[in-house]
Amino acid sequence: MADLKLGLQLGYWSSTPPAGFVALAQEAERLGFDSVWTAEAYGSDALTPLAWIGASTNRIRLGTGVCQLSARTPTATAMAAMTLDHLSGGRMILGLGVSGPQVVEGWYGAPFSQPLARTREYIGIIRQVLRREEPVASPGPHYPLPYTGEGAWGLGKPLKSIVHPLRADLPIFMGAEGPKNVALAAEIADGWLPLYYSPFRNDVYSASLSNAKPGFEISQGVVVNITDDIEKGLLPIKNMLALYVGGMGAKQRNFHKELVSRMGFEAEANRIQELYLSGRKQEAALAVPTKLADEISLVGPVARIRERLAAWRETPVTSLLVSARNATELRTLADVVLGA
């Protein structure tokens, strides 16, 4: 039975920066949390808050969960990761993900084509930058270096980073949902950031993870809700699932809906999307199976949560990433999970 590490999941900002997020990260470090994670969508970025947190902490690892590929070129992402790694004393975890077509094409103005090939090429270039063995070059087709296409002056040449990386093996994680993308993470990355994972359905991902190298990490976000009313405690998870399965993505291509279908809830996923897209959002949440919401979260009295943690310890998951609104909640979560 493996020990589980604990991470603090801060996510991305809503309309304004959340009050006290640095103090929360400091408290997480004091409590023995292993990592703190930020994210980005189409508002706040993932890297700047980590720099702010890193300046006020000493040990806790700093992860992006995730940086979107289309937000930056591979070399720009490598520069930011190297810089943060130096400033934090070697605590950076670079989490990367393709996002989805609505954000990539609607916010970044870039095509979403060939996400797997783009990811492989992107990470390959970052590895070149970090190794610093020779000037960085790539034949493309997604990120050709040097660029020689339309509009080029023909003066570009392969370059080697001026800065020497603190760690040539700076860990790179991938956010991935589809079987091929998860298999790619196992092949080329150092860790995986799933969206949903059920400790009772390890077979959903077992084939995709079969080629993971020793030391491969899996950091899974999980909602922890300590309550005596399990049904009521599951409502926020059901609302979240209704949003993602029903509305996060196009009707004809929703990666979250496809994942829930692979987990054994295809008919339910179809119904959730149908209700959500017709404006019946509350009904969509009520259509989320209690079994699904319960499996991917830790809800109930402390004794029940500790009992269900045993199932998580039998999985390949290495870290649970949790959220908290204040230091009191954080201390309770640390006691329940780390003290189990």
Question: What is the meaning of each model-derived region?
Answer:
Residues 1-340:
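Active-site-adjacent structural elements that line small-molecule/cofactor binding pockets in enzymes
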